[in-house]
Amino acid sequence: MRSVSYVQRVALEFSGSLFPHAICLGDVDNDTLNELVVGDTSGKVSVYKNDDSRPWLTCSCQGMLTCVGVGDVCNKGKNLLVAVSAEGWFHLFDLTPAKVLDASGHHETLIGEEQRPVFKQHIPANTKVMLISDIDGDGCRELVVGYTDRVVRAFRWEELGEGPEHLTGQLVSLKKWMLEGQVDSLSVTLGPLGLPELMVSQPGCAYAILLCTWKKDTGSPPASEGPMDGSRETPAARDVVLHQTSGRIHNKNVSTHLTGNIKQGHGTESSGSGLFALCTLDGTLKLMEEMEEADKLLWSVQVDHQLFALEKLDVTGNGHEEVVACAWDGQTYIIDHNRTVVRFQVDENIRAFCAGLYACKEGRNSPCLVYVTFNQKIYVYWEVQLERMESTNLVKLLETKPEYHSLLQELGVDPDDLPVTRALLHQTLYHPD
């Protein structure tokens, strides 16, 4: 296991308190460049753009925000900012600016103004984690919410009017699932049949597949305030398929996180992937592949840190996403599909973490690691890239180049004679005279 040091960092100002899932990266203004979204317990959403230490704009919400997200939740072809509070308030913000630009090229209509939601609705309270994704394979995105009482609910936006621009619909409830353990993560991965599958983490390095068994041709009741009763939301045990990833579990109650659809190359960008990863608070990391008969364990790693967040990020640029896990003390592990481990240390305690693409510098998205600390700062490490994950040396690199062998032959040195070639390289580098 080798250590790396990333030095390209910007510090953002953030004075609030936040829940672990109230942070995300996404394109909130639909300009193809990602922003950083952070929601706090006072109901304020801060949107950071580029390397500016202060928020580009803020949004006002009702209640303590537990999760934020960015996506085309209304299936209108553009991203919206979604913020959900513990009290059950669901907020939608349309931050796509007007087409009028000021002299500097910025969107003058948004900067400095506190944004109000374009839509607000009450859903069941005690929200914990949120996912915006197509979970049933119909090509439309759904909203999935995990709750503190071990319940997961799926919603869909239902349009009531004809206008393509204005939001004239509401969230409707699709299904409710009841889990045995606490839900800490929601994700989607590609199932054996090529269709998306909704996954939720379960304690003890376990997970469950939630079956989407609703009928698409029937209406759904609105996600109204208060309890939502009715046959369509009756939790059914047969719609929750629990998977234990290990026969020997050290702590069956340990908190578990997961991330799915881990890319295996540029060719799988659109088709998805059946790879998924899990991590636990007691330091277990696993990469698995979902198969038709039984899940396949690709590797398992045990570390001596408490892992509280799990992400995926392509740090080598080859289309293969690495698994990124963060501990409370700032220790970050980056592991590739071959179990090669690289670690990175942030010298502060961390209360929230996310990873992804962010347009910090140079007007383009780059791989970033985002850490929320306890000292009113958010650290964004940008351009987080490695030439390769595995360790190597100069001789191995030179052996891949044809001109290296021809130069050795001109000097009368056998390329297979390692002691002689190492001595020659040492003399060339350190004693050229």
Curated annotation (Swiss-Prot):
| Gene Ontology process terms (BP) | cellular response to amino acid starvation; cellular response to glucose starvation; negative regulation of TORC1 signaling
Predominant location: membrane
* Origin: domain of life: Eukaryota
Where, per the database record, does this protein carry Phosphoserine?
Answer: 104, 220
Where are the annotated FG-GAP repeats, by residue? 19-48, 126-155
Q: How does it assemble?
A: Part of the KICSTOR complex composed of KPTN, ITFG2, KICS2 and SZT2. SZT2 probably serves as a link between the other three proteins in the KICSTOR complex and may mediate the direct interaction with the GATOR complex via GATOR1. The KICSTOR complex interacts directly with the GATOR1 complex and most probably indirectly with the GATOR2 complex in an amino acid-independent manner.
- Please state what the protein is called: KICSTOR complex protein ITFG2
Q: Which organism is it from?
A: Pongo abelii (Sumatran orangutan)
Q: What is the lineage of its organism?
A: Eukaryota, Metazoa, Chordata, Craniata, Vertebrata
Which gene specifies this protein's sequence?
Answer: ITFG2
